[in-house]
A protein has these predicted regions:
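Sec-dependent bacterial lipoprotein signal peptides
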Residues: 1-28
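Acidic, polar-rich low-complexity tracts and alpha-helical solenoid repeat scaffolds
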Residues: 2-7, 28-284
Length: 284
């Protein structure tokens, strides 16, 4: 009879969990392999380029993005020096993007950008490349390398193609991306603050104030600086942060908290928000 040691149970569970996590990836790989075999059977060598390209475009219109990407790649492979190949490289990137295969999309777009830097669609290629990173932004508790790449690529679109519709949309996404990066700094700062590592917390909160001034996290960052400096007994710096908070965000709940925390009658009292004033008129 087989006897399982209690000491081996956690390790066994880890193996089971790992196997379960790998199941979706294995299923996805199997489906891709089936699709590739099916496509290989229907693709003829030296098929007329127009037919091959139109077939790829039809799959794209039908939402069969994996097939579309592979067929566009086939156009590029069979007719590498044609005008069809130039368009197919870009469309392959788009099809991979729609299929959420962002690494493959970036590879296809990099090829297009390298080979055709003067193409009329080059701004769109850079914009689509930026979106490949933007769509992968995850919550602030995870590594933000992808967020940084999104910001870098979106900024490139704005800098290189400022008068395009892509630049205008990129600017909106830059604001959201910067807000996300500021959120990550706040998450780390709170972590340090909760563990009484006040100098480390101050560094994070100050970075939000200095580098992400237009984000929604600045009022809280200033209040957390007040908390951190008071915890270290540096009241003058706490008052300075509170003064900046009160000047820029006098109606903020964070200024109210800082005002109460400092108990400094020389500081301007927090202003009532428009919401509070409206309620006061309604019920008084």
């Amino acid at each position: 009879m087989t006897v399982f040691s209690p000491l081996s149970a956690p390790r066994l569970n880890r193996f089971v969990l790992l196997a379960l996590l790998c199941l979706p990836l294995a299923a996805c790989a199997t489906e891709d392999q089936k699709a590739e075999k099916r496509l290989a059977a229907e693709i003829a060598e030296q098929e007329p380029v127009e037919n091959l390209y139109n077939r790829a475009a039809k799959r794209l219109d039908d939402g069969v993005f994996f097939d579309a990407a592979k067929l566009f790649d086939e156009v590029d492979r069979q007719y590498p020096y044609s005008q069809w190949a130039t368009r197919a490289q870009l469309m392959s990137g788009y099809a991979h993007y729609r299929n959420m295969r962002y690494d493959e999309a970036v590879m296809a777009l990099d090829r297009f950008i390298e080979l055709h830097p003067g193409d009329e669609s080059i701004a769109y290629a850079h914009y689509l490349r930026a979106l490949c990173f933007y769509e992968q932004i995850v919550d602030v508790r995870r590594d933000q390398r992808t967020t940084e790449l999104a910001l870098e690529n979106l900024q490139r679109v704005v800098d290189r193609f400022p008068d395009t519709v892509y630049a205008r949309d990129a600017m909106l996404k830059i604001d959201l991306t910067r807000d996300h990066l500021a959120g990550k700094e706040m998450e780390i700062g709170r972590y340090y603050l909760q563990r009484n590592q006040h100098q480390a917390a101050i560094n994070r909160f100050q970075r939000v104030v200095d580098q992400y001034q237009t984000t929604t996290h600045v009022p809280e960052a200033l209040h957390r600086l007040v908390e951190s400096y008071l915890a270290l007994g540096i009241r003058a710096e706490a008052q300075k942060s509170a003064a900046i908070l009160g000047y820029n965000f006098p109606e903020s709940r964070w200024y109210k908290d800082s005002y109460a925390l400092l108990g400094d009658k020389n500081m301007p009292a927090p202003k009532r928000s428009v919401y509070d004033r409206t309620l006061g008129r309604l019920f008084n």
